[in-house]
C-alpha cells in the first residue's frame, strides 16, 4: 500500500513539472512580437516597435504570464501582438501608466484574462515607448 502511494505521489509531481499556465501555452514558441503604443487617452497608434529577439519576446511573455487580477477599466496604452511562424498567437492589451491600473489583458480559451503588471514590466514598456532598445 505504501509503495502504491509513493508511486502515485511521484506521478503527480512529475505531471506538475510539465504543465504551464494557459497563457504560457498559448504564447509558447512565439518568434516575433509587435508592440503598438497608443497616443494617450486614445486608441490611435502612435508608435510601433517590432522584434524577433528571443530574449525580448521571452521577457515580455513572462511579464504577461503574471498573477490573475481584476479587469480594470482604465483604458489601454497599447498592445502586444505575439506571432509564431506568421500566425497571431496572442493579442495582449496593456496599461503601463495608470496609477492602480497596471495590467495586461488577453483572451485565453475564449475568455478575457487580466493579469497583474509589475513595476519592472511597466518601466520596460515605457522605455521601449521612449525609443530605448535594451532587453
Residues covered by each model-derived region:
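Residue-level signal for mature regions of secreted extracellular proteins and peptides
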Residues: 9-10, 67
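C-terminal motif of bacterial Sec signal peptides marking the signal peptidase cleavage site
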Residues: 13-15
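Sec-dependent signal peptide recognition
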Residues: 2-7
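Function-determining sites in protein domains
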Residues: 17-135
